[in-house]
Amino acid sequence: MLNKPDEAMNIYKKINPIEHTKIKEAVLKYKVEPYVIEADIYSEDNLAGRGGWTWYTGASSWLYEAQIRYILGLNIYHGELTINPCVPKEWKEFKVKFKWKQATYHIKYKQIGERKTIIQNNNLIIKENESIKLQEKGECEIKVYF
């Protein structure tokens, strides 16, 4: 929300459970499920790095919200989509596929270091903070240059 993508990703990685289980030593320290969001990561003495209070659905929904809305920048409101990505500089190109009702959206992002431009189905050009009216059926291709 502060438009600091590298800091946002750093914080996201700190709370993402999979980041705490990449090597055996980290798994032994973390001690909780790598597929469940923890409410706490302890920082004191012999408990430093250990997860706690897992299986809280509120925590997982906030992580999902951070991923979708604030990092990938996808926000659906009243059947309209806005796209405002806040991704690290090293993410030069990436793709997202999502379904809305019976439609499938294929979104291709590309960082070019200029004003944001969105192209929908190769003909409709949307600039800055305009939204896209979502279709309920079919396939839709969106290209995001930012």
Regions found by a protein language model. Give the residues of each.
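Non-catalytic C-terminal accessory modules of carbohydrate-active enzymes
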Residues: 1-146
